[in-house]
Regions:
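Core segments of cupin and vicinal oxygen chelate
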Residues: 11-60
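A short acidic-to-branched-hydrophobic micro-motif
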Residues: 62-66
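A short, acidic/glycine-rich surface segment
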Residues: 38-42, 70-75, 110
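Vicinal oxygen chelate
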Residues: 1, 4-13, 52-56, 74-139
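Hydrophobic side chains in well-ordered alpha-helices
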Residues: 18-21, 97-101
Length: 139
């Protein structure tokens, strides 16, 4: 099982303002590809239908998203990745990672494939309450 830093997510109440700020200051480019296709983005079925801007500096991804303080509640999960934001690691063995969390007694929210096409996503909190996403693509 390996891990690689994938992205930083910030949640905002004013997505155009936040995106413009970072694009202007850091010259971030917009990501538009199949991998970043939202699942049912216009539907309430996913528990989150806010807008998301996918940006990159060429090496690191940034996912700026409209804040939704009720995503966890709507998904019946205790971790809400769309309230304060999160950072993300990508793995090649999400099931193995979930077994490790179980063995260590670390609670997590199994969101499955809910927001990005083909990404299986799990969210947890570190001891200080910071939200961490682990996902495996191609699922």
């Amino acid at each position: 099982m390996n891990f690689k830093f994938h992205h930083l997510n910030l949640c905002t109440d004013n997505l155009p303002r936040l995106t413009k700020f970072y694009q202007t200051l850091f010259d971030l480019g917009t990501i538009r590809d199949e991998e970043h296709t939202r699942v049912n983005a216009e539907s309430t079925k996913t528990g989150y239908n806010g807008k998301v801007d996918f940006l990159s500096d060429g090496a690191i991804e940034f996912h700026w998203a409209e804040r939704d303080i009720n995503t966890g509640f709507k998904m019946k999960q205790f971790v809400n990745p769309m309230s304060r934001g999160h950072f993300c690691f990508r793995t090649n063995d999400i099931k193995g990672f979930m077994r490790k969390l179980d063995e260590l007694g670390i609670p997590y929210s199994d969101y499955g494939k809910w927001a990005i096409a083909g990404w299986y996503q799990v969210f947890l909190q570190d001891p200080d309450g910071n939200v961490i996403e682990i996902h495996q693509p191609g699922m």
